Amino acid sequence: MDVLFSIAKTVSDLKKKVVVGTIYTNVEDVVQQTNELIRTLNGNIFHTGGIGTQPQKEWNFQLPQLGTTLLNLDDNYVQSTRGIIDFLSSFIEAVCDDEIVREASRNGMQPQSPALILLSSSKFKTINFNNSSQSIKNWNAQSRRENPVYEYKNPMLFEYKNSYILQRANPQFGSVMGLRYYTTSNTCQIAAFDSTLAENAPNNTQRFVYNGRLKRPISNVLMKIEAGAPNISNPTILPDPNNQTTWLFNPVQLMNGTFTIEFYNNGQLIDMVRNMGIVTVRTFDSYRITIDMIRPAAMTQYVQRIFPQGGPYHFQATYMLTLSILDATTESVLCDSHSVEYSIVANVRRDSAMPAGTVFQPGFPWEHTLSNYTVAQEDNLERLLLIASVKRMVM
């Protein structure tokens, strides 16, 4: 991995710096680095492709070295360099594509394709430049079974769920009480509802509880908690729990109420939040949201008509809130909405018509991976996302 990353980083730097008019001394370091890379690769033959629709190709390295000049780089120098850049870029993309369509149920983080396995041999160890990136550090740590640290913005932590829990419902669903929940990506939306607006609840306060669990613990969490739940706040026709009929979820947002969010790690209470806004939590792998809906002591006639004593009830009083994970660190590799690596992997596997593997579902769906995130999947995903980041450097 280190070698492939070094080649890609060198090619990327060469592409950016070698332009007409540039003073040679400004690019001398990357030129010398490229020449050292070429000397090491020349005389070797690599093979890529052969899986799905990927064509088989042989890469015979016989590249000329880049020259030196005392002057600014002219068009001839840039054009000759461009040929080397194009060859190396095509080689890197082919190796990455070949690696992306391979997976292994054991040692999935190690190279799987013949070309990358060959590059990992001792004869190429001198190609080891610019390996200070966090991706390489994490891969090296994970391959040694140490504890890497991954930093994410808007991490895709929550499985997609869009459902409800009923605590009370008459046969006609004219009087219902329960909790709707919607989770996806980095967001958890909750809507506690009651047609009677806690009319018969003790102390005019109705309690609702939602328990959630993450597939992997997260730490150093920055999150936003706000009123409202935009994805579940509209009138919606929902199936009943037995799927025999349908009923109308018709929410009216209620501000009277309180909430508590408890964060746990390995069953131990870590933190508790009772306020809206930006909050931080040290670490957690599960959470409990408790909502107390409070019936107002006084209501206007219009509000009383919406929630008449004894019914009929055409609306549900609804206390809603949204929890969004903004930043977090983990010891597990995840899909990140601010990164394109996961989509690069998915697109290459689809475009290559990759046969079904032993680790991931066909189509590489993140939701399915997250719902049953195994060690084998995590190991393979570590490798695949690193390879995708390498490919992105030369795209």
UniProtKB/Swiss-Prot annotation:
CC annotations in GO: viral envelope; viral intermediate capsid
Oligomeric form and interacting partners: Homotrimer. Interacts with the inner capsid protein VP2. Interacts with the outer capsid glycoprotein VP7.
Keyword Acyltransferase listed: no
Organism expressing this protein natively: Rotavirus C (isolate RVC/Human/United Kingdom/Bristol/1989)
HAMAP family: Rota_VP6
Highest taxon of the lineage: Viruses
Keywords noted in UniProt: Capsid protein, Intermediate capsid protein, Virion
Family of the protein in this entry: Belongs to the rotavirus VP6 family.
A biological-process GO annotation: fusion of virus membrane with host plasma membrane
Name of the protein described by the UniProt record: Intermediate capsid protein VP6
A molecular function GO annotation: structural molecule activity
Described purpose of this protein according to its UniProt entry: Intermediate capsid protein that self assembles to form an icosahedral capsid with a T=13 symmetry, which consists of 230 trimers of VP6, with channels at each of its five-fold vertices. This capsid constitutes the middle concentric layer of the viral mature particle. The innermost VP2 capsid and the intermediate VP6 capsid remain intact following cell entry to protect the dsRNA from degradation and to prevent unfavorable antiviral responses in the host cell during all the replication cycle of the virus.
Gene3D superfamilies xref list: 2.60.120.170, Viral capsid alpha domain
Intracellular or extracellular location(s): Virion
